[in-house]
């Protein structure tokens, strides 16, 4: 799934997203990585430095220029949080198949590149009138986190889109993020479609499917998923107690039940506790991975990757929807594709 939220303060965000104690994998990229043409333009490449990241979120560019307002009125950025469905987190983090996380990261990056090409905008003066103009570049800090607040397996990526983009005039300007919010369902569907291609190529089978393109892995029961999802249970319980049920209610319930982040003192012990719990639940990730490997080996070449034609069509809304649906072999109404996907356009 994909959730979108504004990043209010630069200092707190830089500390939270780049904190290495949030990770559980020994080989996790503690500092995150820069993504986007906007980052390239600013000379930001490779691993994210926390101090540099904080400066960018404050609107302070490497060349000394400032973008946006100073102080509290400045919007630091937009946090796009891409979360893998629970079954895939269990296979990856409990079972140790890091290829799944790599596949999801690649899918997220592909979506971000599409988003910056089609959704990045700014406001600028054009012949004496302020207009919204397309920029085609974003500055993104991409961070991998592996647990939720209850220290359960929860692989997700924070794509923190800074409030800066280069305008057609070559100047750094504040990003207009309206389309990132408006197209969040489309962005999630694109990510999951790309992810599905990858995991099927690895030999995994698709299980339960739900709205907005989300799907679970076959072989992981709802009981097993729920046992590792107490954080979700807390949010749902709070929602049931609330009078408000409209848009934003889930976000409010999440904030109301959010505990303080706890530093993971012993990652090895945490991993062992996950493994012990999995055994109690009868979750055999090793067997699932072995079956997937055997299935992939029996189908040499696996599922083909996206063709060049589909990639070219990916920037054209309805054409992308049609092409990806044909590529995946899905029909109208398939839960892997949002109903209104073909009507969406940047």
Q: Across the structure, where does each feature detected by a protein language model lie?
A:
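Intrinsically disordered, flexible peripheral segments
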Residues: 1-345
């Amino acid at each position: 799934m994909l959730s979108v939220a504004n990043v209010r303060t630069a200092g707190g965000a830089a500390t939270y997203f780049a904190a290495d104690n949030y990770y559980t994998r020994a080989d996790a990229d503690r500092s995150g990585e820069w993504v986007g043409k906007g980052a390239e333009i600013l000379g930001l490449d490779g691993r994210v430095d926390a101090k540099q990241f904080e400066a960018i979120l404050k609107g302070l560019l490497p060349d000394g220029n400032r973008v946006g307002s100073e102080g509290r009125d400045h919007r630091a950025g937009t946090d796009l949080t891409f979360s893998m469905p629970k079954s895939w987190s269990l296979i990856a983090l409990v079972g140790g198949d890091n290829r799944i996380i790599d596949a999801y990261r690649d899918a997220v990056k592909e979506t971000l590149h599409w988003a910056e090409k089609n959704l990045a905008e700014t406001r600028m003066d054009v012949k004496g009138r302020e207009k919204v103009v397309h920029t085609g570049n974003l500055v993104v800090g991409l961070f991998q986190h592996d647990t939720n607040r209850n220290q359960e397996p929860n692989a997700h990526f924070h794509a923190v889109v800074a409030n800066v983009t280069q305008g057609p005039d070559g100047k750094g300007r504040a990003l207009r993020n309206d389309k990132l919010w408006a197209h969040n369902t489309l962005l999630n569907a694109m990510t999951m479609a790309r992810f599905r291609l990858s995991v099927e190529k690895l030999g995994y089978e698709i299980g339960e499917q739900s709205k907005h393109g989300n799907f679970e892995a076959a072989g992981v029961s709802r009981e097993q998923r729920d046992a590792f999802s107490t954080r979700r249970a807390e949010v749902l319980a709070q929602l049931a107690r609330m009078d408000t049920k409209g848009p934003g209610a889930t976000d409010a319930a999440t904030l109301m039940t959010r505990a303080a982040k706890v530093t993971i003192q012993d990652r090895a012990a945490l991993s062992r506790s996950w493994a012990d719990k999995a055994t109690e639940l009868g979750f055999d990730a090793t067997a699932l991975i072995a079956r997937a490997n055997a299935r992939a080996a029996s189908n040499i070449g696996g599922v083909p990757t996206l063709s060049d034609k589909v990639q070219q069509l990916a920037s054209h809304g309805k054409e992308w929807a049609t092409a990806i649906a044909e590529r995946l072999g899905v029909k109208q109404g398939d839960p892997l594709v949002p109903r209104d996907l073909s009507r969406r356009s940047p």
